[in-house]
Amino acid sequence: MSIVTEKDDPSLLGESNIAKKRPTKSRKKDPNRPRQSKPYNQRFRHGAGWPTIIWIGLIHLGALAAPFCFTWDGLIAAVFLYYLTGCVGVTLGLHRYLTHAGFKTYKPVRYALAFIGQLSGEGSALDWVATHRKHHAHSDQEDDPHSPEDGGWWAHIIWLAPHHTPAEKDELHMRWGPDLRKDRGMWFLHQTFILWHLVLGVALMGLGYYLGGWYTACSLVVWGMFLRLTVLLHVTWFVNSATHMWGYRNYETTDKSTNLWWVGLLAFGEGWHNNHHAYPRMAVHGHKWWEFDLTWNVLRVMRMCGLAWDIVDYKQKTKDGTVKV
């Protein structure tokens, strides 16, 4: 099944964000049409999205128990699952593959990446991809789902709080994620999003009990689920907020995307966000030698193993290290 990307539909990217061969001055915005931020009463016109609020709240509440049930087994579980669900699942699977089609792979790998990505707690693959494609189409404009132009806290977490009607959700899915919405496997994962977190939690508890009794079982659940999800959620949210507020820019796009080193490290290369907004389909986000991109190295290993091909890579670099197309 083909994947809808900005290559097929330019509105997924937005003409204003197509990078030039060399960095150029951003096109000026029309002074007669200032950006209009929607007031909160309009954003919450359908009320609060309590299922999402409760989901995020419970994750954070459970993470508070981490200092009281530390074990090395719990720490190992947290670090391993943070890498697996964050790097392999979110940045490689949901973002660079399913959203932007930065490479090709086998269908079983496609579903595996989507499944692992959903275990990040950030929503189903369908929700994640559709929202991110909409973000690229309207980056830092009125219809951007999470722009700091509407406030830093809005971009970081509050944007998740409003309730969206079934009709609004269906419109989001069909406009920005029709390839996933029409895929029965992806739709199944979408409908069973919570179930697989419960299964993982039970599996961690069983493993912990086997390794060291109930204390270790609680440790694996708290560290491997609640604390890991809390950290991963905020790191991903920093990509939405911090990398549109602070940092440096290699390319002059008309949004406010930036490169931020500490987000780059914590988010496995996603913090080189200005590079990504300049060339969204590129599977490599680090465009200068010091911009380390762990996800790109994972993809290189997949290519060597025959699990990835037709990778969208830069063709050459200019003398200053920026990408030339």
In which residue ranges do the predicted regions lie?
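C-terminal accessory segments of proteins
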Residues: 232-250
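Pore-loop/selectivity-filter region of tetrameric P-loop cation channels
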Residues: 87, 96, 122, 264-275
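Active-site-proximal inter-transmembrane loops
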Residues: 176-185, 246-272, 278-279
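Non-catalytic, topology-defining segments of multipass membrane proteins
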Residues: 1-237, 282-325
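Catalytic glutamate of the conserved HExxH
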Residues: 83, 96, 241, 245, ...
